[in-house]
């Protein structure tokens, strides 16, 4: 058994310049917890594999392709491979989301 204390994981350097902590990384999948401060957002980007998001705290705005929705705690959002997407925190609260990429990407994310 492996137990991960997310608060002790290092913040990964990403082009989004946000708090992103890798919590799971195998040949089959990778998972990252992203924390967005109030009014913070990810840059629109394309991921080479399918992604699903599970909202851990508060409410955020997700954009996938031409769709936009407000999503709150305990909601899961599917995002197909190669479709532009991003998260936006328009609130005054800290937003936290679990990002799971399956299968584990072999090429990088592309910013738009």
Task: Enumerate the predicted regions with their spans.
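Short, conserved beta-strand element in jelly-roll/cupin
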Residues: 35-37, 47-62
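Short acidic-glycine-tyrosine-enriched beta hairpin
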Residues: 67-81
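Conserved short histidine dyad/triad with adjacent acidic residue
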Residues: 17, 32-47, 81
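Ligand-binding loop in jelly-roll beta-barrel domains
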Residues: 81-106
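Short beta-strand His + acidic residue motifs that chelate non-heme Fe in jelly-roll/DSBH
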Residues: 42-44, 62-63, 79, 85-91
């Amino acid at each position: 058994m492996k137990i991960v204390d997310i608060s002790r994981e290092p913040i990964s350097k990403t082009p989004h310049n946000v708090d992103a902590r890798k919590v799971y990384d195998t040949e089959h999948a990778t998972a990252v917890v992203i924390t967005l401060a109030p009014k913070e957002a990810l840059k629109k980007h394309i991921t080479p594999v399918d992604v699903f998001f599970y909202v851990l705290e508060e409410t955020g705005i997700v954009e996938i392709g031409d769709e936009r929705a407000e999503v709150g705690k305990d909601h899961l959002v599917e995002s197909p491979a190669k479709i532009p997407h991003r998260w936006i925190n328009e609130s005054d609260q800290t937003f936290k989301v679990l990002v799971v990429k399956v299968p584990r990407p072999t090429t990088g994310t592309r910013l738009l």
